């Protein structure tokens, strides 16, 4: 029996990267998956892939910065699969600029996608979890939510906010048997990381080689992060809440 049998997991940003890897792994472990993403084509692709593997999945279009979309995603989970046990708030973006270079629109966009989305999804998910006897929420922060990084002011601010929002939620809803934790990935091989090379006007190969400069000598894979998310989603972490799990190959050691 899989670790997530008879569980329903709602994953934001499930169309690609870490979210996609988590959707596949969670489904392999028995969970029914709600793929929530603004990218309908790739969001549906992951559903089709899960169904080809005899899993259960459903796609819901979702702009995570909009309250009505977040509420709709939670309602779809309940209507389709009968409840909601796991929420993986994974959608995120990065803009590599300092506060001087950064425009107000980009600041707002980063904060909305990276932080406001967690507030909105959790606002609608927690009452469902509470009525069902509990659940678990995983928020994606970053190593740069623990320490600062260069030319990433809005990103660092947003990911630091995720760490403390996670702790606050864990305190508030622990009595309701809702656990809340966050993952702090280091550099992980995704399209978002590779896009940073473009933003920084650097050659991609050189940028990725620098990103691998850590004790384990490589960047992370999406599967590395998905496995950490699985631990936090499963009963293996039943006494873990309010924590930040750093998964970075020793980058912050």
PLM regions: where:
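A glycine/serine/threonine-rich, flexible loop-to-helix segment
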Residues: 175, 187-213
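Active-site helix of classical SDR
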Residues: 122, 158, 166
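Residue(s) in the substrate-gating loop at a strand-loop-helix junction
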Residues: 142
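Short C-terminal tail/terminal secondary-structure segment
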Residues: 147, 230, 241-253
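Alpha-helical segment proximal to the catalytic Tyr-Lys
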Residues: 127, 171-175, 238
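Substrate-binding pocket helix/loop in short-chain dehydrogenase/reductase
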Residues: 98-99, 106-108, 210
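Active-site loop immediately N-terminal to the catalytic Tyr-X3-Lys motif
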Residues: 100, 147-153, 175-176, 217, ...
């Amino acid at each position: 029996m899989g670790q997530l049998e008879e569980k329903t997991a709602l994953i934001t940003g499930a169309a690609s990267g870490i979210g996609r890897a988590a959707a596949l792994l969670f489904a392999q472990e028995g969970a029914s998956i709600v793929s929530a993403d603004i990218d309908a084509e790739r969001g549906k692709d992951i559903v089709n892939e899960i169904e080809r593997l005899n899993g259960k999945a459903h796609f819901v279009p979702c702009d995570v910065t909009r309250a009505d979309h977040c509420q709709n995603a939670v309602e779809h989970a309940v209507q389709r699969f009968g409840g909601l046990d796991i929420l993986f708030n994974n959608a995120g973006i990065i803009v590599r600029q300092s506060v001087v270079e950064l425009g107000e629109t980009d600041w707002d966009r980063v904060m909305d996608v990276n932080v406001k989305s967690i507030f909105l999804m959790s606002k609608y998910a927690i009452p469902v979890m509470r009525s069902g006897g509990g659940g678990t929420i995983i928020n994606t922060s970053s190593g740069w939510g623990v320490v600062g990084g260069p030319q990433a002011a809005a990103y660092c601010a947003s990911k630091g906010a995720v760490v403390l929002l996670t702790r606050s939620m864990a305190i508030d809803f622990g009595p309701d048997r809702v656990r809340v934790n966050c993952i702090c990935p280091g550099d992980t091989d995704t399209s978002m990381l590779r896009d940073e090379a473009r933003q920084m006007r650097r050659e991609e190969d050189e940028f990725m080689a620098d990103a691998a400069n850590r004790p384990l000598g490589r960047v992370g894979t999406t599967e590395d992060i998905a496995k950490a998310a699985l631990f936090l989603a499963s009963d293996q972490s039943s006494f873990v809440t309010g924590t930040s799990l750093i998964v970075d190959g020793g980058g912050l050691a």
